[in-house]
Amino acid sequence: MLAQARTLTEYLREQPDGWLSAHHLMKSLRHDTLRAIPAPDAQGRTRIEPPRADQRALLKRLYLQQNWTEMLETADSTFSRGANHLWLDLQWYIHQALTKSGQETLADIIVADLKGLLTRLAGLETLAFSD
């Protein structure tokens, strides 16, 4: 199902003003299906593998280069892979890319979506990956 959703989101992104629809489709599949936060250990770490170092480095580099378009595409694409939907930094990168490229309305929607997720899954923001 996730592979089919990726195909559909690629199509939607290519449509005029289709980014938000594509983003919400993937976010619905990845976030709205979560029923509880991952079980943490005593230090607040989960057994979930962290984002790859190259993914972290790429997003940092794109931010420093102020390449907002590529940063948005990279963060959005990364979100759909592995356990990256739990990597809340991606929401920050998406928000930054939208804000810095003058798309404040979309950035506000990202904030509202994240507030909803954190309200529904209280404590998610306190967790850490296994590293």
Show which residues each predicted segment covers.
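Terminal low-complexity "docking" segments
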Residues: M1-D131
